[in-house]
Amino acid sequence: MHFTLGFSPCPNDTFIFDALVNQKIDTEGMTFDVYLEDVQTLNDWAKSEKLNISKISYGVLPIVQETYSLLSSGGALGKGVGPLLIAKKPIVDLESVNEMKIAVPGINTTANLLFSMAFPNAKNKQFLVFHEIEAAVLSGAVDAGVIIHENRFTYLDKGLVKLIDLGAYWEEKLNCPIPLGGIIMQNKFDQNTQSKIESLIKKSVEYAFENYPQITDYVRGHAQEMSESVMRQHIDLYVNNFSIDLGIEGKKAVETLLDVYKKTNAI
């Protein structure tokens, strides 16, 4: 069977899918056309049902649930891994964030959902690709920005400061891991096929962990601007046991996020 598969070029995703797409494991006759795109593009594609299997932000899951099913493997959940709100200078009162122009990495992202949960009255948002946000803050194009991925490791080097850890805010309020990104598969495939894909992704993650901390050429080739230490930070932060299987705790966290979505109607 042949599938279209999309995920991001970020080290956590290439680490997870390397063994699967490069046939380092037995793919049991399953083959893939692979699309590597930023998460906002993948979110948009999911809304138009472009791909059979895709990484998405959990923030877009409520919108695509009628056409896609969430798989239990390959995703990113965790603690201490959430988005950060950063600026050029500290502020005295976080309430002033409501009056600021804020850069956010995409409308249908978990980052936007978490920001909206913390600052429901902040309406002056500019939606940018995640790697453009630091520059927008530094140039003064926006007053502050919500950063994700490797920018969590680089903002201090650029002289920026953290205003609030949105992930910590989530954990404090809701006492569960943060669902950041998940893997979805079109509902047109039967449960048996979905389970096979889920199992293959699980095996791919397990294979990657067995060979870690080696950084493969596949991971390195899609993260050429990063040092290997930053690649490992990225993997260590976003790939864990929840990536192998959501389990009961992970599934409860996803249900919590869906409840928050309904309450905030932020996206």
Short names for language-model regions:
Residues 3-4, 67-76, 101:
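A structural signal for short loop-to-beta-strand junctions that line the ligand-binding cleft
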Residues 27-41:
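A short beta-strand-loop structural module common to alpha/beta enzyme folds
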Residues 38-40, 46-62, 129-130, 147-153:
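Beta->alpha turn/N-cap motifs
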